[in-house]
Amino acid sequence: MTGPLFVFVHGWGFSPGFWDAVRDALPDGESVAVDLGFYGPPSLPHIPAGRPPAGRSVVAVGHSFGALWLLHERPFAWDGLVLVNGFPRFTEGDGFAPATPRRVLDRMIARFDAAPQTVTADFLRRCGCEAPPPDGLEPARLGEALRALRDWDARDALTGPALALAGAQDPIVPPAMTEQALSGFDTAWHPEGEHLLPLTAPGWCAERIAAFAAGLTK
């Protein structure tokens, strides 16, 4: 049997290296990481079309906006989806509540054109990341993704096997938002976890991602 293929997608303001510790902690399988191009050219690793080889599952793993991007864009087929601090929609509206008020994103977008570095750094700090954004910030792609974060609604795309990994102390995606957005799907809660579980609890994430993947082939 061939081990699973894990495809990781980072969130808004981050880069593929965000996943390094989780990928290193996975006990089995192969992993690749999508680059949404926030600090350089975007890159989507080649994912074989059609069904995977017998016994091999494809598991998509998205953090925060990365989970929304996967659901909205569907860039490849997967057998299971893991949403880490993730959601199928970010802003309130159309019966989706509690969630982030749309005006919060409106303010970020209004400021972004004039001060992309500042807006990005402020958001990263709110997430719990004190390090400044890396060099090479790409305002056009970050700005487009910020508008997507405000406008996209991928609830109808959330079908099939899925697992949520959530932080009970997440200031960006609070527990009440996770519970209503992902009701009906298995959710693993990290009691001290905030919004950056792949950085603060990589082993915890890897263990649960691997167990979810193993369950897909049973």
Features from the language model and the residues they span:
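Short beta-strand/loop motif that positions the catalytic acidic residue
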Residues: 158, 164-166, 170
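Acidic catalytic loop of the alpha/beta-hydrolase fold
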Residues: 168-173, 195-196
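Gly/Ala-rich beta-loop-alpha elbow adjacent to hydrolase catalytic centers
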Residues: 61-66, 70
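Flexible "cap/lid" loop of the alpha/beta hydrolase fold
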Residues: 75-111, 144-154
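Catalytic histidine-centered segment of alpha/beta-hydrolase-like enzymes
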Residues: 193-206
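Short alpha-helix in the alpha/beta-hydrolase fold that links the catalytic acid
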Residues: 160, 174-183
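Conserved HGGG/HGGXW glycine-rich cap/lid loop of the alpha/beta-hydrolase fold
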Residues: 2-43
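Conserved alpha/beta-hydrolase catalytic His-Asp/Glu region
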Residues: 111-156
